[in-house]
């Protein structure tokens, strides 16, 4: 009978899931398992009885039971077939109830074992949580201390950067020739060293802070994971520990979030101030280089101008000496019969042009250009030197005419050489006088030629050959008259002597002209060299400007990388807040259940 009842019970649970649902639902919703078992038994009996009755709905799950006494033996004998069937069904239901109670008792034992196990596990997890919570607290304190160290290192770095900028600005305002330039340069080097050390200390502190923040976040997450395991315990003491742990954990998470926000603010502020300091430094360097470039550009223009002035001055001197050389060569040609015409050919074109211009306009441009120099410089110098040499020759017994002629010749040569030397020295050392002299000579020559060239071309086109012939005749007759007035003999020997002397004079003047042009070339080369050095310094400063632009670009890129780090920290903080919110929602759902 028991086996039959068991089979009926099992088949009832299998075929009608409402039996299991009614029993299990009562067990889950009540903490008093004995009452739950009694109610479940009544629900099972009511459900089974409803299935056996034809007019009963299967949805009825509860009936009111009445206590009945079992029938006596006499009553059993008097029972009809219907009564016997009813008695049999009653015994069957009693057996079915006994089986259900035994199953419920076994399940109750299982639940009690599970509760004890959860209690032990809760106590163990509570200990682990307290340990993890202590570690999270220590890591959070370390993270807070690291943030303070980072802030201190940042302040030191800002001060060092400011000191470096001030030292560099002071150095830029000084000239390398100033007495305090070396001291300012040493101060810049020392400030740069301090700024580098402060930057390294700041980087180390930042790295330590990042590591401490990562460690604190990991340990806080570990505490959260342990806290999640606490939710399955049913022990009241354990529940109290869990509640206290939740409060501690929530406060720690909030504190960790605040510290992460502070660190993100410090990193962002440090990045922005670092970029501003770099921009200020690069602007100072750029302004210094720009001032240097302007200075070198002015030096280049000045040296180029000096070279041009020297070239113009030497050109004027060459013209003057060329004219003198041509005059002497032509005069010598008269006495030597053409032996020095090769030497005269160098300046003949200038002299012929001058004679043509003079014949056409009545004005000699060479005479007009050389009059100020001849009247105020060369003529007094020639007279002074000539008189000194004449007196010296007369003291040696030379006749007066010969001494005067030799003194005039030597005086002219020495005066020309002295004039060349003075102009070269002034051009190299005293630049202002040379510039004035060169400007005066070039202006006189330029204005004279500018006025006379149109008339020259016009007259030359009309009667060039006639003017050339007249000019040469005037030169020859003029030279003859000069020789006669000076008392020179006209015989062949005297002419040859005078011609040789004039050839020597012409040769000396040619050497002087060559020396003057060489000296001018050297002076011009010096100025060109100085201009080249100024141009090289200018190009170097320009390269430094390009390098500063490259450094500025790198600073902007570093700023972008630091912004990425800040974004990652913000993302980590948002993730921590999200996890905290999820844990809070989970706890809220469990408390409502």
Swiss-Prot record:
The UniProt entry lists membrane topology as:
Multi-pass membrane protein
GO BP annotations of the record are: killing of cells of another organism; protein localization to Golgi apparatus
One Pfam family name is T3SSipB
| UniProtKB keywords | Coiled coil, Host membrane, Membrane, Secreted, Transmembrane, Transmembrane helix, Virulence
Q: Name one GO cellular component term.
A: membrane
Q: Which domain of life is it from?
A: Bacteria
Using the UniProt record, give the first listed, main subcellular location: secreted
The knockout note for this entry states:
Mutant can assemble a fully functional needle complex and can secrete (but cannot translocate) all proteins traveling the SPI-1 T3SS pathway, but the mutant is defective for intimate attachment.
Where found?
A: Secreted; Host membrane
Q: Which residues form a coiled coil?
A: 126-226
**Which positions, given as ranges, span the membrane?**
330-350, 409-429
Which residues does the annotated region (Essential for secretion) include? Answer: 3-8
InterPro entries, per this entry?
BipB-like_C (IPR006972), IpaB/BipB/SctE_N (IPR032391), T3SS_SctE/BipB (IPR003895)
Q: How activity is regulated?
A: Secretion is regulated by the gatekeeper InvE/SctW.
Hey, which family's this protein in?
Belongs to the SctE/SipB/YopB family.
Q: What is known of its domains?
A: The N-terminal region mediates SPI-1 T3SS-independent secretion. The C-terminal region is necessary for SPI-1 T3SS-mediated secretion. Membrane integration requires both hydrophobic domains and the helical C-terminal region.
Q: By its UniProt entry, which NCBIfam families does this protein fall under?
A: PRK15374.1
Complex formation: The core secretion machinery of the T3SS is composed of approximately 20 different proteins, including cytoplasmic components, a base, an export apparatus and a needle. This subunit is involved in the formation of a pore, called the translocon, in host membrane. Interacts with SipC/SctB1. Interacts with the SicA chaperone. Purified SipB/SctE1 assembles into hexamers via an N-terminal protease-resistant domain predicted to form a trimeric coiled coil.
As for what it does, the entry says: Component of the type III secretion system 1 (SPI-1 T3SS), also called injectisome, which is used to inject bacterial effector proteins into eukaryotic host cells. SipB/SctE1 and SipC/SctB1 are inserted into the host membrane where they form a pore and allow the translocation of effector proteins into the cytosol of target cells.
Protein name (database record): SPI-1 type 3 secretion system translocon protein SctE
Organism the protein comes from: Salmonella typhimurium (strain LT2 / SGSC1412 / ATCC 700720)
Its taxonomic placement starts with: Bacteria, Pseudomonadati, Pseudomonadota, Gammaproteobacteria, Enterobacterales
Q: Which gene encodes it?
A: sctE1
């Amino acid at each position: 009978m028991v086996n039959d009842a068991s089979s009926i019970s099992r088949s009832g649970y299998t075929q009608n899931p409402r039996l299991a649902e009614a029993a299990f639902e009562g067990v889950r919703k009540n903490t008093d398992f004995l009452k739950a078992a009694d109610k479940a038994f009544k629900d099972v009996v009511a459900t089974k009885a409803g299935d056996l009755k034809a007019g009963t709905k299967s949805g009825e799950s509860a009936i009111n039971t009445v206590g009945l006494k079992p029938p006596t033996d006499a009553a059993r004998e008097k029972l009809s077939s219907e009564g016997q069937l009813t008695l049999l069904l009653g015994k069957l239901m009693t057996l079915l109830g006994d089986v259900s109670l035994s199953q419920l008792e076994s399940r109750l034992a299982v639940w009690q074992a599970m509760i004890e196990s959860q209690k032990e596990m809760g106590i163990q997890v509570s200990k682990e949580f307290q340990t993890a919570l202590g570690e999270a607290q220590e890591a959070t304190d370390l993270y807070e201390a690291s943030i303070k160290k980072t802030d201190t290192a940042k302040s030191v770095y800002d001060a060092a950067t400011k000191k470096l900028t001030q030292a560099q600005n002071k150095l830029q305002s000084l000239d390398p020739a100033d007495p305090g330039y070396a001291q300012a340069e040493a101060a810049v080097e020392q400030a740069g060293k301090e700024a580098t050390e402060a930057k390294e200390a700041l980087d180390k502190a930042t790295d330590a802070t990042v590591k401490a923040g990562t460690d604190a976040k990991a340990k806080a997450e570990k505490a959260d994971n342990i806290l999640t395991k606490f939710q399955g315990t049913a022990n009241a003491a354990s529940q109290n520990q869990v509640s206290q742990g939740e409060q501690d954990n929530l406060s720690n998470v909030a504190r960790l979030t605040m510290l992460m926000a502070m660190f993100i603010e410090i990193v962002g502020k440090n990045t922005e101030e670092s970029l501003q300091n770099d921009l200020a430094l690069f602007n100072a360097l750029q302004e210094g280089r720009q001032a240097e470039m302007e200075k070198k550009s002015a030096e280049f223009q000045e040296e180029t101008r000096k070279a041009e002035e020297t070239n113009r001055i030497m050109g004027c001197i060459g013209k003057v000496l060329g004219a003198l050389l041509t005059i002497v060569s032509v005069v010598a040609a008269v006495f030597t019969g053409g032996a020095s015409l090769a030497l005269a050919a160098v300046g003949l074109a200038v002299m012929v042009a001058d004679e043509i211009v003079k014949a056409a306009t009545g004005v000699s441009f060479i005479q007009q250009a050389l009059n100020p120099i001849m009247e105020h410089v060369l003529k007094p110098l020639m007279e002074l030197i000539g008189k000194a040499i004449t007196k010296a020759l007369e003291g040696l017994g030379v006749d007066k005419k010969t001494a005067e002629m030799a003194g005039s010749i030597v005086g002219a040569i020495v005066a020309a050489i002295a004039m060349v030397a003075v102009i070269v020295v002034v051009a190299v050392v005293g630049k202002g006088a040379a510039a004035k002299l060169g400007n005066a000579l070039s202006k006189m020559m330029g204005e004279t030629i500018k006025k006379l060239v149109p008339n020259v071309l016009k007259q030359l086109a009309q009667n060039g050959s006639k003017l050339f012939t007249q000019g040469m005749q005037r030169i020859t007759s003029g030279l003859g008259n000069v020789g006669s007035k000076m008392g020179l003999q006209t015989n062949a020997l005297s002419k040859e002597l005078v011609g040789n002397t004039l050839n020597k004079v012409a040769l000396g003047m040619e050497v002087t002209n060559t020396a003057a042009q060489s000296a001018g070339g050297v002076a011009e080369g010096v100025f060109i060299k100085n201009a080249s050095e100024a141009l090289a310094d200018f190009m170097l400063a320009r390269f430094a400007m390009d390098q500063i632009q490259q450094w500025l670009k790198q600073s902007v890129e570093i700023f972008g990388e630091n912004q990425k780090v800040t974004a990652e920290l913000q993302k980590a903080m948002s993730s921590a807040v999200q996890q905290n919110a999820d844990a809070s929602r989970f706890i809220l759902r469990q408390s409502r259940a």
